[in-house]
Amino acid sequence: MPERERRKVLLIGWDGADWEHIHPLLDEGLMPNLEKLLERGVMGNLATLQPVLSPMLWNSIATGKLPDKHGVYGFMEPDPDNGGARPFSSLSRKCKAIWNILNQEGYRSNVVGWWASHPAEPINGAVVTNMFNQVQREPLRVPPGTVHPAERSDELGDLRVEPHELTAQDILPFIPKAGEIDQEKDPRLRAFVKVLSDCASTQAVVTQMMEDGEWDFTAVYFDTIDHFCHGFAEFHPPRQEHVEEETFELYKDVIRTAYRFHDIMLARQLELAGPDALVLLCSDHGFHSRHLRPRGTPREPAGPAVWHRDMGMFVMSGPGIRKDERVYGANLIDVTPTLLAAMGLPVGDDMDGRVLVDVFEKTPEIRTIPSWEEVPGDAGMHPPGTKIDSEWSERLTKQFVALGYVEDHSGNRDKAFESAETESDYNLARVYFSSRRYQEAIPLFEKLVERFPWEDRFIQHLIVALMRSGHSAQCLRLISAAYPGSWVPPNLAMTRVFAIQGAQGREAALQAFEAIPEQALAHPRMRRQVGTILSNLGRLEEAAVQLEQAVQDDTDDYAAMGELARVCLKQRRWEEAADRAMESVGRLHQQPTVHYTLGQALLRLGYPEQAAHAFEIALGMRPGMYGAHRHLSTLYAKQLNNPEGAARHHVAARELRKEQRERRASGTDDQRAKTWPLPEFPSPEERFATLKKERMSPEEQEQLKGSSGRSFTIVSGLPRSGTSLMMQMLDAAGLSPQTDGIRKADEDNPRGYWEWESIKSSEDLPELFNETEGLEERAIKVVSALVSSLPLEHSYRVIFMLRPLREVARSQSQMIARLRTTGSAQDEAALVEELKDHRERVLFHLKRQKNIKLLLVRFPHLVADPVAVCESVTEFLGEALPQPEALKSVIDPALYRQRSEGGSENENASGSEKE
């Protein structure tokens, strides 16, 4: 647009923010800055997409496209270069984000923290990626690709707020009783501080970037609300019955204070943007906070997403935007088209979103082009051949594992590759499924069911996709094969009734429905499905009762509202049908069947123009709706004086009718049965047993710990921390080592490494501990990176060696240099920080395990005062040590090389301690 029309545009993302949390705070006057924004603009719900996974959603927000077009299908993707898996990245995205489009038009942009934005794209402006929370400040270390331009890495990296820098003044507003928390048993405070420091870091960076340079567009993403909700929504008021009063009192204020903190940050962001800026604040989904909060997490990767609510929040404010108004029917794919229109730029016809014209005081001229992908010029994207930094990939993967979004396959690249490929296929299939492209979803679900016949989530999605696509007979065959008895899961019981109606008629469906146990239908989440079944079976009064209750349970349940509109239409309650349909599309616009219902109701009410508009909207989303074409043909011919439109829709209706007849005659179900033979399924009980084994719940993990009655002696620690010496000591004292002698003694370890090659893969540990004879009577050396993967069912006595980290780093570096392997040039100070973080995480884990007894042995004290340390080892191992007096016989101070100058971090600590 012309230079004189340019104004700053600020896009703010609050992941997981929900009006259900915000409205009470607004009513109490506790979010004054958001209140001011609302007074100057519009607000509304922002419908999410399926699956509700943040990397997919925020890239849809930034592109205006569904994930099958932008290419980000979840958290992890298969790594074709190195094997294994890597996080989805800016290189995974297949199309231009809004900042790439603006780059081509000469705009200057800031992008901070956006999902899958690493490595930073070379746009006109500045980018700080979602890798910024991995920055280390002491010493300063910014991962490559985190900041663009790279020369600003030190400047912006220095803004990183470390967790240890937060004080009680920062923490107590969120957790007033933080001082009462036993952090050895409760890890939540530690996790909370990490998330809060990340949030403060993002705010510091974005405000610095807004302050110190000319910019036209700034996009900033905060994950704090989402992370806090995943950690603490269970404790949000009102207290649930299963939540202990003491824990509730500790954490009940976290989420409320998080929103207030974001409101404080918002004030500074708005100040820097200026009064004439266009501001759009949104979230990608909501978060359950009331009676619909789940009691558990599904046994699947990305299981925590079950907490996500389908409605996020949306606020838009600035010159030309309506004031203090509500907007209905917005979807997160509408954000980019709306911003482009507001900036006077054309919208791509290939964008799945639409311009939210209702936000504007005066509807702007909406120009379109076929696709921004076809527009030449510098879009500030990575050149072909750009590679992913493997270190970044590994660090971010660990973060996803810690958050519960991906499975931990560290040490097994093949399994990591398979898991990433599986979840990407599953998520893509769900994109097709949720956008009603069942014929594209079905082959993906079929492939997944063939590979993983024990995964009910794949089986159930395939069953529903077959039913919705009209393959009723095949759907019933699949249900019978997967659930051979009379029992089926309650949600599939409804699907089975739908399929029976499609294959065998209404009477058979009615019998199947009446055979469903009443308790299976009583759950609030089942009311919508029950209402839909009753409507299909002609029991309209009962259907209306169920659907009304579903809407009362969840006032944003657009699907229940749409089905209720259909019931009202059948009951000839035209006005109520129109009202319910408008309420439904006001929450989610992309519902062609509900727009069709609205058109039917408006037609009955005597509004032909409005009815035609509703039918046209329905056809814009689903061109193959025979009824909409038929109605429009009649309306345009008889009431709206549009003979061309009438003829066009008449031809379309006739062609669709012909296709329907041909499809019925071709025997679609028989064809599908031939193309995809049903696999052999384990029984539901066997599938559940496999699922429990593959993905245990935290409660089951606790029950399993130590349950075998077997106990093992483990020596662990960082490489080069004294583990080999401890193995020698135990051998001298009569506790034989489990070693194969494959790794020979050398200059670095003249007396040998005392290692067991077979134990160097975490995937092999269960089999090794269960099948190796005599292992309980031996000492086993397990490196610190694997000690957290010990099989849960056994008990362990772990001797963990501690050595000053500077000594460990120097010893490792010199050993690597002598071996001439990779890594010898790594900065020692940076290595010390990495080792410190790793050791802290390992020890934190070990100290919290009820099946692990832990003895910490400090290497300098072992050499300086062997008698005292040997006494501690003797007491710790007890009868497992036949000749304890021989422990100190192998200690040779001459082998203590790479000593720290001027002492160490452990010099004031005792030589050993039990945990």
Model-derived features: positions:
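PAPS-dependent sulfotransferase catalytic domain
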Residues: 779-882
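His/Asp/Glu-rich, glycine-adjacent segments
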Residues: 65-246
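Substrate-binding rim/cap in mid-to-C-terminal beta-strand-loop elements of soluble/periplasmic
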Residues: 267-270, 296-346, 362
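PAPS-dependent sulfotransferase catalytic core
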Residues: 49, 124-131, 678-775, 889-899
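The conserved 3'-phosphoadenosine-5'-phosphosulfate
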Residues: 346-362, 742-750, 826, 830, ...
